[in-house]
Regions:
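Charged, flexible cofactor/metal-binding loops and thiol motifs
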Residues: 116-129, 143, 151, 157-312, ...
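A helix-coil-helix interface module used to build multimeric assemblies
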Residues: 1-201, 206-212, 275-276, 291, ...
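Short linear loop/turn motifs
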Residues: 57-60, 225-230, 386-390
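Generic, well-ordered alpha-helical scaffold segments in large soluble proteins
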Residues: 40, 61, 65-68, 90, ...
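Short, well-ordered beta-strand elements within core beta-sheets of diverse protein domains
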Residues: 42-50, 166, 236-244, 369-376
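Glycine-rich cofactor/substrate-binding loops
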Residues: 1-36, 97-98, 265, 280-449
């Protein structure tokens, strides 16, 4: 069955090629397609295009299909093109002529669009929860490590004193910017395209505001052409937000690979979280961080993959956009898995103490010494040259306790004043900005009408 069936058989080779992986991927859209159909038929009854009797049999049937799909028992049968055709077929089998009415005033184009929006909205919500978990873990470890000094680097050269608190806190704050991008992506997904039909609207007296409220959307994609043009654009926006999270995770993983090596020795993974070598018995490799890095890099390439599918397409819908699903749908599980394993690894890694007692890192305190002399009246440039000469001839020494060192750094965002609570407040405000409660209530109301 095809929604566009005109009574003649399509060439088998053409059908295989054009359907591609759609049947497999469309299973992820099943619950969302059913929700969209429930909202659509409810609206059709409201505007007089469907009788109350028809609606009274359609909604219970759709609710049962929803339960089946939610339980993972929904199947797209052999010969059925996609999830949309399967839902209509099952309704028609069960309800007869009534099932054939659900597509009134709707195109497969806006049906796909609303499915994608609902799917994306739900997936971003899951990812946001996992970003929050990693954020809180990083902040917790940052607090635990705020008195554990380590060298900071520029150009991979020892630069100034840092701390585990400052290092891990940096990645926590990076996640607040990533969350801001996720919020923007969520807001783009939270706009209703239903009613735009094939991109030019419908002569049926549709009530698009009603379906917007029924599905918990914040607003409409108003212009019918733009609703179709937004296909690919939304996915690219989401992919960019996800690639930003992936970049943060990937950089953290690279740091951990480096800091775990014998040449640094700042952190240590439990033996149970490392792998070995078939020839070198001493090896305890941080494969978990290496694979996090590789997976993150792959996600970072995704926005370009999507852009290259949609670039220079003229106005209107084109089948090219079907290919976006193949790279877009796996994205969510890929990043979610990375977030979970990164959180687990950060929770369990050991932070080493007394790193800065190594004479190798003494020059990290040179700026502090320059500032001390400048505060005592030596012109800054002269103090700089004095300390530089002492480092060159090997006479530079700096002695201070951890507490004394931290006390010299009082400004916001320094090792002595991490501002973790202020960073947490930023994250909390971003999380609160998403109207999840209203969305959940709308979907619950729709399922229980």
């Amino acid at each position: 069955m095809k929604l566009w069936d005109k009574g003649y058989k399509i060439d088998d080779a053409i059908e295989r090629f054009t359907v591609g992986k759609d049947k497999e991927l469309d299973l992820l859209l099943a619950t969302h397609d059913i929700l969209g159909t429930m909202a659509h038929v409810t609206m059709l009854e409201h505007v007089g295009l469907l009788s109350k009797d028809d609606l009274d049999v359609l909604l219970p049937a759709l609710r049962e299909l929803y339960k089946e799909a939610e339980a993972g028992n929904f199947v797209i049968e052999e010969g059925i093109e996609d999830v949309h055709s399967q839902v209509e077929l099952m309704l028609t089998r069960q309800l007869g002529e009534v099932g054939k009415k659900v597509h009134t005033g709707r195109s497969r184009n806006d049906q796909v669009l609303v499915d994608l929006k609902l799917f994306t909205r739900a997936e971003i919500e899951k990812t946001m929860g996992l970003v929050e978990q990693l954020f809180h873990t990083l902040q917790k470890r940052s607090e635990e490590g705020k008195s554990l000094l380590m060298p900071g680097y520029t150009h991979l050269q020892v630069a100034m004193p840092s701390s585990f608190g400052l290092w891990l806190g940096a990645y926590a704050e990076a996640l607040t910017d990533d969350m801001r991008l996720l919020v923007a992506a969520f807001e783009q997904a939270n706009l209703n395209p239903l009613g735009s039909a094939a991109g030019y609207g419908s002569s049926a007296p549709l009530n698009r505001e009603m379906t917007t409220k029924l599905l918990g959307f914040a607003d409409l994609d108003y212009n019918a052409i733009y609703a179709q043009m937004n296909r690919g654009r939304m996915e690219r926006t989401v992919a960019f937000a996800y690639s930003s999270v992936a970049e943060t995770i990937g950089r953290l993983a690279m740091d951990c690979c480096m800091f775990n090596s014998q040449n640094f020795g700042f952190i240590k993974l439990p033996d149970t979280m490392t792998t070995g070598s078939s020839i070198m018995p001493h090896k305890k490799n941080p494969d978990v961080f290496e694979l996090i890095r590789a997976h993150a890099n792959r996600i970072c390439a995704l926005p370009d993959s999507i852009r290259h599918i949609t670039t220079n397409l003229p106005v209107g819908y084109f089948r090219d956009m079907q290919l976006i699903k193949e790279v877009y749908f796996p994205l969510f599980d890929q990043l979610n898995n990375l977030l979970e394993i990164t959180t687990y690894a950060v929770e369990n890694m050991e932070m080493k103490a007394d790193i800065m007692s190594n004479p190798l890192y003494a020059p990290a305190f040179s700026v502090e010494e320059v500032n001390r002399r400048a505060a005592n009246g030596v012109p800054f440039r002269d103090a700089y040259r004095q300390v530089a000469d002492e480092i060159t001839n090997g006479t530079f020494h700096h002695e201070a306790t951890v507490e004394e060192t931290l006390s010299h750094y009082t400004h916001e965002g320094s090792i002595g004043n991490l501002c973790n609570q202020q960073i947490k407040a930023k994250m909390d405000a971003l999380v609160r900005s998403i109207p999840l409660e209203g969305i959940h209530q709308a979907i619950n109301n729709l399922l229980n009408r």
